[in-house]
C-alpha cells in the first residue's frame, strides 16, 4: 500500500562530502559512553517517564534492564571530551552522536527542545527544586527537572559546552555528526507541553 505522506525524498543533487567517503565513524549514545561530570547526572525520581520515576544507575557495570529507557548511567559531553585522545588513537575520524537535544529519555529520540543540548549531557549551573516522591508520577511536581531542562543559563551553558567539544574534536582531526530527529517529538516537547514544564 503506497501512501504519499510516508514518501521521503532524497535531496536532489546531494553529493556525499569527500571527508565522509571511507571515514571511520564511531557512534556514541552519550548516556552510555563516559561520565565526565557527575553534577549533571539524572537523579532518581527527578521526573516520571512513561508512567514511572526515572532512576540513576549507581554501578556503571550494571547491565541495562530490558525496559531500560528510564535508567540513566550519567554519560555526558564532558565524558566525550575526556576520551577524544583515546578516540583519535583508535583511528576515529567522525563521531556520530545519537540525539543530544533536551529530551526525557536516555536515547533522546523524543525531543523536548530542539534549540538546546540537554543539560544532563551538558552543564547544569542552576540546580534546585524538589524531586518526585516515590509513587508520584505527576511531572507538575518535578520541579528539579523543570529547572534543569528549561532554565536558560543551563541551556546556554550546555550549548557552549557542545561548541567546545566540536572545537576540541576538530583539533584531534575528528568531525562531528549529530542525529537530529525532526520528523517527530515527544510529549514533553515545549510545543505540546503535556507535562506543563513550559506553562507559566
Regions found by a protein language model. Give the residues of each.
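Acidic/aromatic-lined carbohydrate-recognition and catalytic surfaces
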Residues: 2-200
Amino acid at each position: 500500500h503506497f501512501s504519499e505522506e510516508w514518501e521521503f525524498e532524497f535531496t536532489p543533487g546531494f553529493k556525499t562530502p569527500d571527508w565522509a567517503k571511507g571515514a571511520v565513524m564511531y557512534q556514541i549514545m552519550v548516556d552510555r559512553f563516559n561520565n565526565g561530570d557527575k553534577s549533571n547526572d539524572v537523579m532518581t525520581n527527578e521526573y516520571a517517564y512513561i508512567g514511572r520515576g526515572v532512576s540513576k544507575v549507581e554501578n556503571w557495570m550494571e547491565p541495562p534492564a530490558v525496559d531500560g529507557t528510564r535508567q540513566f548511567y550519567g554519560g555526558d559531553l564532558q565524558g566525550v571530551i575526556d576520551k577524544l585522545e583515546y578516540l583519535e588513537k583508535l583511528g576515529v575520524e567522525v563521531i556520530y552522536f545519537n540525539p543530544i537535544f533536551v529530551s526525557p529519555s536516555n536515547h533522546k529520540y523524543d525531543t523536548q527542545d530542539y534549540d538546546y543540548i540537554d543539560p544532563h549531557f551538558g552543564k547544569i549551573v542552576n540546580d534546585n527544586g524538589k524531586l518526585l516522591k516515590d509513587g508520584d508520577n505527576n511531572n507538575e511536581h518535578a520541579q528539579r527537572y523543570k529547572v534543569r531542562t528549561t532554565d536558560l543559563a543551563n541551556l546556554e551553558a550546555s550549548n557552549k559546552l557542545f561548541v567546545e567539544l566540536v572545537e576540541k574534536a576538530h583539533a584531534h582531526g575528528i568531525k562531528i555528526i549529530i542525529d537530529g530527529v525532526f520528523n517527530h517529538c515527544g510529549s514533553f516537547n515545549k510545543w505540546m507541553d503535556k507535562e506543563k514544564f513550559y506553562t507559566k
